[in-house]
Amino acid sequence: MGFSKIALFSLFALFGLPTSLAKSSEEWRDRIIYQVITDRFAVDSDNTPDCSFDDSSYCGGTWSGIRSKLDYIQGMGFNAIWISPVEKNLEGSYGSDGEAYHGYWNTDFTQLNEHFGSEDDLIDLITDMHNRDMWIMFDALANSMAIPGPTDNISYSNLVPFNDSSYFHPYCWIDYGSNNNTDIEDCWTGDDNVILADLDIESTNVADYLHEHIHDMVERYQIDGIRIDAVKQMNPEFFPNYTSAAGVFAIGEMFSYDPNVSCSVRNYLDSITSYPIRQGIEFAFNYTGAAFEYLQEIDTQFQQACEGQDMSVIGNFLENHDLPRYTSITNDTSQDIGAIVFLLLHTGIPIIYYGEEQRLPGGSDTPENRAALWNYGYDTDANYYQTIRTAIALRKQAISDSDSWTTDSHSYLDYDLRHAVVRKGDVLGVYTNYESSSDNVTYDVSSNFDDGTVLREVLSNTTTTVGSSGALHVTVVSGLPQVYYPEASLTSFGNFLGTATSYSSASASYPSTSMSASLSSVHTSSATSSSKSSSSSSSRSGSSSSSSSRSGSTSSSGSSHTITSTSQSVHTSGSSTSTSSVAVTSTAYSSSSSSSSSSSIESSANAVRVSILGVAAFIAIVLFI
């Protein structure tokens, strides 16, 4: 790193100030995350290295490559990026497991992974992101370290700083079917090619180092949030001090489809990734099992299991680096698009895995679900890219119109095997699992909007008027989702869309000119309007208490269904959690909390101090040079 960057970071540290203001759970609610596998997303040159579909070696993606594609990511509306772990990893190739291109075989907490670029490259990426008001999320590793197999030849000598067996739990293979938490938390993962030795995080020496490490990483690289890997395999008592040391929003990977198991760590973390909701979405849109009835049921169970906790910051996703690409589950584009749109407009923080916008193919296992995106291109006119862009723009519109939209309850107005009608605030979605080749299906929806309200279906860019008693006549074309929003509230939609482009042709497409092709020109004249709409909240139906009853009047035969409101409301805002600040002494971290008003005052004060120190830093550097 050049002197100027080190000097600036050091000057902030000298005054005891963070290099970036800590981002809380409340601030992360408004974010939409794009997850990348650093090695597979983009290269930093015009060259496109060979990287086969099932390649398990490094392919050449870098931090500079991500930086070169920020326009591409931001063009969809994403304002946060989750990157692969950055620490140095195990070198070499290990049988069928290949190389550590994914970043999860860490061996040295003191060095960066040089395959992804230099420290300057990483800082330049983050600096450019922050200049765009995009936030960075680091993947934090604290559960294990990688050792070459086999197990009868274990050596810790190359691990930094934990180069002795005393820093690890005794060797034993984890039994995922065990009900013994100690077995799951203390035993090891991996295989005879690469062993992931389980760190003894109950040890004071180990825990203190990990606290210091994550604190220093956040300070040095201006990290806005962390995703903690493998929290199911860790003692949850470790997390409060660890996240306090980080001082930023922390979301944990809780790999369990059981709502009760998933929610068991919510008292220790700001958030978790929602595997139960992901499974519900898969079953519903792929027409598997109970379909939308199962999605509604698992959604309700998840809310109940996490009762009293803030569900508005749950991380919702359809794909990730550990799961099959959805294209391997269904080859139907309408089902796929419906699942993505549902995810983007649901309660929680949406997370889209790189390549979903290009409908990246992928197998049911790694590395087939981690293909190099440059082999498929970065087409900003692609149907999926534009659909994601439109749905994100609507999400931002809804948040702009109502301070409470992210924490509003969502209601399943009706649901059965083949469809669901979901309302959250003023966003009304009609979703089905009909295939793209299916006939049109008509529904009469009880929308809970006032009579005479003009609604725009944002994906096809058409309007309709609400009839008597809130009735809405909906025709689902080729199985595609329908998403409605009050026309009068779309004044700044073009601003959220940004530069407009139209849908390209695809096997499943919308019947008329796309929202992104026209609304930006229709509404740009009033795009600067960002006031909160009081009329929006007055027409909401999502604040009523939960009801276990559902309509029995839906028909599953024929092409016409009459839907009556069941007001199946799912509450989302429990006891809101805030990220604790961290006070650093020579040996310990102490957490403290403050009210939202004092946090606001402190943030303002920090902003002033940072501005002053920024000027001071510049002067100091110039004088030094």
From Swiss-Prot:
Membrane topology annotation: Lipid-anchor; GPI-anchor
GO terms for MF: alpha-amylase activity; calcium ion binding
Glycan-linked positions: N153, N163, N180, N241, N260, N286, N331, N440, N461
Entry-linked SMART domains: Aamy
Signal peptide: 1-22
Residue numbers marked as site, Transition state stabilizer: D322
Gene Ontology cellular component terms for the protein in this record: external side of plasma membrane; fungal-type cell wall
Sequence positions that bind Ca(2+) 1: N143, E185, D198
The UniProt record lists the keyword Signal: yes
CDD domains: AmyAc_euk_AmyA
Entry's cofactor comment: Binds 2 calcium ions per subunit. Calcium is inhibitory at high concentrations.
Propeptide position ranges: 604-625
Necessary cofactors: Ca(2+)
Lipidated sites in chain (GPI-anchor amidated serine): S603
Main location as per UniProt: membrane
Keyword Membrane: yes
Active site: D229 (nucleophile), E253 (proton donor)
Positions that bind substrate: W105, R227, K232, Q233, D322, R370
First-tier enzyme category under EC: hydrolase
Reaction equations catalysed: Endohydrolysis of (1->4)-alpha-D-glucosidic linkages in polysaccharides containing three or more (1->4)-alpha-linked D-glucose units
GO biological process: carbohydrate catabolic process
Family named by the database record: Belongs to the glycosyl hydrolase 13 family.
Identification of the protein by name: Alpha-amylase 1
Primary gene name: aah1
